[in-house]
Every structure is written in C-alpha cells, then in structure tokens.
Amino acid sequence: MEAAVAAPRPRLLLLVLAAAAAAAAALLPGATALQCFCHLCTKDNFTCVTDGLCFVSVTETTDKVIHNSMCIAEIDLIPRDRPFVCAPSSKTGSVTTTYCCNQDHCNKIELPTTVKSSPGLGPVELAAVIAGPVCFVCISLMLMVYICHNRTVIHHRVPNEEDPSLDRPFISEGTTLKDLIYDMTTSGSGSGLPLLVQRTIARTIVLQESIGKGRFGEVWRGKWRGEEVAVKIFSSREERSWFREAEIYQTVMLRHENILGFIAADNKDNGTWTQLWLVSDYHEHGSLFDYLNRYTVTVEGMIKLALSTASGLAHLHMEIVGTQGKPAIAHRDLKSKNILVKKNGTCCIADLGLAVRHDSATDTIDIAPNHRVGTKRYMAPEVLDDSINMKHFESFKRADIYAMGLVFWEIARRCSIGGIHEDYQLPYYDLVPSDPSVEEMRKVVCEQKLRPNIPNRWQSCEALRVMAKIMRECWYANGAARLTALRIKKTLSQLSQQEGIKM
C-alpha cells in the first residue's frame, strides 16, 4: 500500500517544475502578447496589445493630476533589465510616478498621489518666505562679483574631449551617423532618429568653433566620434523657434539629398541656463551666399547649383500620399543665406524654422498669426502689398518660386564665360538700401514693377539664356502665372543633359 502511494511522487514533482518554468517565462517582456488597459484606445474597448509591458503613470502638478495608461513595445524597453520609461521622474512643478507590469490588464489601477493641500503659514514659514528673497538677492550679487573677478563669462559648455561611455549602451562602437540615418530611413518611421538616440548623440558632441550667427542663434562646427556636424544653438528665449524647426525637420519622408540632413534635437540644461540644440550635417563651403562671394562658377557649376536647389524645393512642395506619406511644405524664407553648398558642388535647402505644412485631408495650414515673415528683399509682390491669400496653400509655394528666381539671378551673375562675369550682389542692390524696409521694397517691386537687371551677355550663352527665361517666369506679379518647382527642375534637368553634365 505504501509503495502504491509513493509511486506518483516523481510525476508530481515534474508537474510542479513545469508550472514554475512557465510562470518564470511569463515574467519576461516579449514572451507572449499582453493585453493592457489603454485610456486612449476608445475604438478597441480601451485595450491595446504589446510584446513588451503594460504601463501606467500619474503626473502631479500644482493644479492637476494626469493619468496615463498604455502599452510599451519591447523595442522601447531600454535598457531591458531597467527600462528608462518605467522609472519615475520629477521636473520643476511636477512629479511623475510610473508602474510597469507584465500581466493582462495589470495596469488598470489607480497609482497613489502625493499632492496634499498646504496648511496656512506659521511664524517660521512666514519668516522663511520673507528671508528667502533677501538671501537670493545676496547670493546673486556675490555670484556676480565672483564672475566679474575671475573674468570668465561662459556662453557655451565645450567639453575638452568626448566621453564615449555616455553613448555605449545605446549606440555600438564603430557606428557612424551614416549607419544610423540609413537604419532610420530603411526600417524606421522616416520621421527621424529615436529621441533617446538623438539625445545620446547631442550630449557627446564636442563643439570646435563658432562658424556663424543667425536670426535665432549661433551655429557651431562640432565633432561626434570624429565626424563633423553642424550645431545650431538657440537661446532659451527662442524655444518656440527651436521646437518648430525640429518639428518640421522630423516630418515623415522629408529626408532628401537637397534638404539639409537633420540628425538630432536636444535641450541642454547646466543649471544656470538652457541651450536648445539642432544638430545637422556639416558642409564646409557654408551658405550659397558665402560661396558666391568667394568663387565664380562655370556653366556646369551654375547648372548644378540651380538644379539641386530646384530639386530640394520641389521635394518640399510635393505631397506624398500614403501611410508613410509627407505633407506639402512651403519654406517662406528662401534666400542664398539659407541654402548650403555641399562638397560635390550641389545645394541643400536649410533653415526650415518659418516653414508651413499643408494638411490636404482638412485643407488647413499650420501657420503662425504673423504672415509677413522672412527676408524683406526676397518677399514676393503679393506678400509686400499684403494681397496674399493666407488660406490658399498654393500662395506660399508661389512666393517661394519668386524667391528662388532671385537666388538663380545671384548664381548666374557669377557664371564666368571667357573670363567675363559680374561681381556678386544681392537682388535689387542698385534699387534699395542694404537693409530695406517693407515699404521700400513694395515701392520698387509692386508700384514700379522693377526686377533685377539681366545683362545682355547672357543671351550669347544657351545655359544663361535658359536661366534668364526661368527667372522672368518666376518673377511674374501674378503668382498663378509663375512656374512650379517641378517644372523648373525638369527644364534644368534637360539643360544639364544637353550640356553633358552628370549630377
């Protein structure tokens, strides 16, 4: 009888071990599909499915509490053993509590909050409130004296050397920016590198030298793992400009060989001030304005500069329909200073901070209230006389075409044939002051209907004759009569084939 009872024990032990193994496997993210509570998934009965973890958070500010429940994909669990997304965080004025779990609907819970009503101020607290500002003023004065004494006013934190350990967990050794961009364009969403990768790159860049200043900030040449990059640094006052430009650059399917290659955006806070960074490809020739000031160009060089500019603008203006589509974009500040010259003699369009996107589904334009923006010298007639139709997206594209015609004029003047060329000049240099007002430009362009002078010598060269014809058709007072960027691109492509030019 005892032998009969003892016989099943090994079988029972095996069943227990199997159950334990199954339970352990269930704890690993990605082991099986999880069903999680999702407060935004109204069409799916507030349920989402993931191969990672369920997530719930509560963010507390001084005046409200925000609850968030959703799925976290396994690919976003970085690092895998202690994901950043599952860690609590705190910022000035807010505290976020998070919880990650791996059971079906395990995130359908209410996390405890810590915000409590503050009691009335007692004598000690009242004294602290009064003494606090006084102490702050004293400390500030002492700090100013210290800074003046040492004569060191630091505007940018420039590390002496890179610390590769900072990016090792996320970006493997030997990985280049070209590798990261290629991976992003072939397997990603097409809207830019993941934010964590962008931040990792930005925080391991070594600034080398300041190479220019613009309307919203300063541009530096920097290095990341030996590769040169351009870093546009905005002050904290220009946060909206920084955010807008980063947002436009990360538009799905925007990447193009004739649009400046965006790499990363990051905000760097050292406790005293905040710097807002935009990291992009570095082009040693600088802007087209600088390039034309320094060099003349051949017929081939002129066609390359013009065709690549037209190709970039045509890509901006084009809407790509589909799940990985791209909205049509108008630049609104096209000029030679916002076009960069690449090492191979072609151009890429930069400075998209004033650009607007068109949503064809709703026929709306995301535009700031102030529509008279950009550089006055390059403003189209309809912008100068305030007759532009702000609700019609084609109006903005036509204004870009007018500006590109002026850029082509700048390029063609520097085309040297038989040693003959014109000095570099800005459009309307002989008609308006160096910094013209809107009224001065309106008088010349709209009332007198003047346009930049086209030299007679251009008629003796087929390439310059074609360029002159394109310019005139870009400068029509009636925007609807102007050429499109795609038409200009095709005309210049035919010209390059006739001249035997390989792009």
Curated annotation (Swiss-Prot):
Found in all tissues examined, most abundant in placenta and least abundant in brain and heart. Expressed in a variety of cancer cell lines. Kept in an inactive conformation by FKBP1A preventing receptor activation in absence of ligand. CD109 is another inhibitor of the receptor. Changing T204V: Reduced phosphorylation. Reduced response to TGF-beta. Residues 148-503 are cytoplasmic. Changing P194K: Loss of interaction with FKBP1A. There is a cross-link at K268 (Glycyl lysine isopeptide (Lys-Gly) (interchain with G-Cter in ubiquitin)). A motif (FKBP1A-binding) lies at residues 193-194. The keyword Cytoplasm does not apply. The active site is at D333. Residues 175-204 form the GS domain. It is found in: Cell membrane; Cell junction, Tight junction; Cell surface; Membrane raft. Changing N45S: In MSSE; hypomorphic variant. Its EC number is 2.7.11.30. InterPro entries: Activin_recp, GS_dom, Kinase-like_dom_sf, Prot_kinase_dom, Protein_kinase_ATP_BS, Ser/Thr_kinase_AS, Snake_toxin-like_sf, TGFB_receptor. Residues 205-495 form the Protein kinase domain. Residues 34-126 are extracellular. Changing T200V: Loss of phosphorylation. Loss of response to TGF-beta. Keywords: Aortic aneurysm, Apoptosis, ATP-binding, Cell junction, Cell membrane, Craniosynostosis, Differentiation, Disease variant, Disulfide bond, Glycoprotein, Growth regulation, Isopeptide bond, Kinase, Magnesium, Manganese, Membrane, Metal-binding, Nucleotide-binding, Phosphoprotein, Receptor, Serine/threonine-protein kinase, Signal, Tight junction, Transferase, Transmembrane, Transmembrane helix, Ubl conjugation. Phosphorylated at basal levels in the absence of ligand. Activated upon phosphorylation by TGFBR2, mainly in the GS domain. Phosphorylation in the GS domain abrogates FKBP1A-binding. There is a cross-link at K391 (Glycyl lysine isopeptide (Lys-Gly) (interchain with G-Cter in SUMO)). Transmembrane serine/threonine kinase forming with the TGF-beta type II serine/threonine kinase receptor, TGFBR2, the non-promiscuous receptor for the TGF-beta cytokines TGFB1, TGFB2 and TGFB3. Transduces the TGFB1, TGFB2 and TGFB3 signal from the cell surface to the cytoplasm and is thus regulating a plethora of physiological and pathological processes including cell cycle arrest in epithelial and hematopoietic cells, control of mesenchymal cell proliferation and differentiation, wound healing, extracellular matrix production, immunosuppression and carcinogenesis. It is linked to Loeys-Dietz syndrome 1: An aortic aneurysm syndrome with widespread systemic involvement, characterized by arterial tortuosity and aneurysms, hypertelorism, and bifid uvula or cleft palate. Physical findings include prominent joint laxity, easy bruising, wide and atrophic scars, velvety and translucent skin with easily visible veins, spontaneous rupture of the spleen or bowel, and catastrophic complications of pregnancy, including rupture of the gravid uterus and the arteries, either during pregnancy or in the immediate postpartum period. Multiple self-healing squamous epithelioma: A disorder characterized by multiple skin tumors that undergo spontaneous regression. Tumors appear most often on sun-exposed regions, are locally invasive, and undergo spontaneous resolution over a period of months leaving pitted scars. Homodimer; in the endoplasmic reticulum but also at the cell membrane. Heterohexamer; TGFB1, TGFB2 and TGFB3 homodimeric ligands assemble a functional receptor composed of two TGFBR1 and TGFBR2 heterodimers to form a ligand-receptor heterohexamer. The respective affinity of TGBRB1 and TGFBR2 for the ligands may modulate the kinetics of assembly of the receptor and may explain the different biological activities of TGFB1, TGFB2 and TGFB3. Belongs to the protein kinase superfamily. TKL Ser/Thr protein kinase family. TGFB receptor subfamily. This is TGF-beta receptor type-1. It comes from Homo sapiens.
